[in-house]
């Protein structure tokens, strides 16, 4: 029975530099044990390793792939191993290939388990938790690792000493030899195609058709029979949520959300078309309650507003002529397209005002304006709180103060005393609101409230 020529490890005293994971190769050269993500675990001579932080790690370091490509900028502060390129190339050429699954599916058959003429083909390994074959798995269904090598050495020692380990046939060969592997664990990295220790792994490498991840990558594995289940083996990879989902949720909560409900903004972000006009058409997202800006993400609309283009009308309030402190409301009957001239008018009016991060828009229940300005008819003057839109608190700090009895729903002096405010009351009746001092409220306090719940006190951060 032939065994693979694996590296022989001996414990050696670490040098004064504090290097760890040192071993002697077959020639007696002091080497550093390194995991190569491209191939397997390698023994690189210590004289060919450049000093980095990898020598101070408690776990086995990995080989820096960026350094091999000439792109590592960390230098001596890198936490991976930097080694000479020619030495790494020579060591990689000595590696045949990584074990894929088992001897039955292409891995190297070190013990002739696939040869029917060899008695090793009648060796089975008993794994108590397995349901495949009643827990007795053929040796050909294993990849050669340290546990299998240890078990076979014990069997050889018992056979050489004359101790019977199994029933024998007429030719003196055992009919069936059972190896006990109840003390060894199953390698989860091998199941996920991520084990780089190959024959030197201290866990069992079992055929991937038998091992099924029953806990979605939690590290606990169960053995089952494919024929008994009557279907394909379960997924090998772990079913984990994407990191971008959590990132997008954080961005949705912090500040302005990534996608806006259709009830919140009747006119989405403007996008500049080839004809020089601004398009307001929106397309539905995969979420039924949200709609994206047609053609690109909201980030693109923000970036385009910084270029030679009109600012966003939904963010920049339209100021009434003669009343710079009173922003004009955009009603829900806004047309689907607007010309470049109108957009430039918005830009001029926006320039006369302030910065758009001083404004907030209501969630739902009224027209998408709610840029509450100086108004003493429907609502009180500047720096006052407005709570007419379903309990949401909004306000304005434009620095102009009150400028006469003008409702923010009507331009100029055309305010009518018969129309209704967003809270359903007549504009001729002043609404009691709580006054907020401008000194206690910063310009960054007026942000979008994504939670839909306004704290008591009026102002939402």
Curated annotation (Swiss-Prot):
Ranges spanned by the short sequence motif MKT1-binding motif, renumbered to the chain: 446-451
Expression induction: Induced during the differentiation of the bloodstream form to the procyclic form.
Region described as Disordered: spans on this chain: 224-243
Domain of life per record: Eukaryota
GO molecular function, one term: RNA binding
Disruption phenotype: RNAi-mediated knockdown in procyclic form does not affect growth rate. Simultaneous knockdown of ZC3H20 and ZC3H21 in the procyclic form results in a severe population growth defect and a shift towards the bloodstream form transcriptome. Simultaneous knockdown of ZC3H20 and ZC3H21 in the bloodstream form is lethal.
Entry annotated with the keyword Zinc-finger: yes
Residue intervals of every C3H1-type zinc finger in the record: 63-85, 181-208
Keyword annotations of the record: Metal-binding, Repeat, RNA-binding, Translation regulation, Zinc, Zinc-finger
GO terms under cellular component: cytoplasm
A single GO BP: mRNA stabilization
Biological role stated in the UniProt entry: RNA-binding protein involved in regulation of mRNA stability. Promotes mRNA stabilization by recruiting MKT1 and PBP1. Stabilizes transcripts encoding mitochondrial proteins.
Protein name: RNA-binding protein ZCH321
Biological source species: Trypanosoma brucei brucei (strain 927/4 GUTat10.1)
Highest classification ranks of the organism: Eukaryota, Discoba, Euglenozoa, Kinetoplastea, Metakinetoplastina
Gene field: ZCH321
